[in-house]
Regions:
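Cytosolic-facing loops and C-terminal tails of multi-pass membrane proteins
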Residues: 160
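Nucleotide and nucleotide-moiety/phosphate-recognizing core
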Residues: 1-114, 119-138, 144-157
Length: 160
């Protein structure tokens, strides 16, 4: 199941990318460079066309689309302005659904304090969606070799 088939995503923004512009999606520069992930979220939320954003790092390509759909479903039934994914007791603040009207609160965090994502979440409130899939789906992958290696270590070939 592809991401576009599983999720009603109509607006994709890239943050934190400093390489050659070779993607069809807009790259949103941080308004306050050097403020980490929260600075990127703040800039993207100001450009977003929708009241909610699904936040997902490019270095976690194995997260199943079905898990993201479940995360979105929980966020739709939540009063929290941020619903982040949790797996095996590990909370992932860069895998979540955020209300874009949090941009002003993010601005305050990055200009008046350190700009830590968890400090922001603790101050503004959040809830967790507890994933039901194995932890390895959330592996941080930054190179093609690791991308090929991780699934191979966890899938059993049916026809050997």
């Amino acid at each position: 199941l592809s991401l576009h088939d599983a999720l009603p995503i109509c607006d994709i923004l890239l943050s934190g990318y400093h390489g050659e512009n070779k993607y069809k999606y807009p790259i949103i520069p941080d308004r306050f460079p050097g403020k980490g992930p929260l600075g990127g979220l703040e800039a993207c939320f100001r450009k977003a066309k929708n009241p909610y954003c699904l936040v997902l790092g490019v270095d976690v390509p194995l997260v199943p689309a079905e898990e993201l759909a479940a995360l979105i479903r929980q966020s739709l039934h939540s009063d929290a302005k941020a619903v982040i994914l949790s797996h095996g007791g590990h909370e992932e603040p860069l895998m979540g659904v955020y209300c874009t009207d949090l941009a002003d609160a993010m601005l305050e965090e990055i200009t008046e304090r350190k700009g830590a994502v968890f400090a922001f979440l603790r101050k503004n409130g959040y809830e967790c969606y507890e994933s039901q899939v194995a932890d390895w789906y959330f592996s941080n992958i930054n190179d093609p070799e690791t991308y090929k290696e991780i699934p191979g270590n966890h899938f059993i070939e049916k026809y050997v």
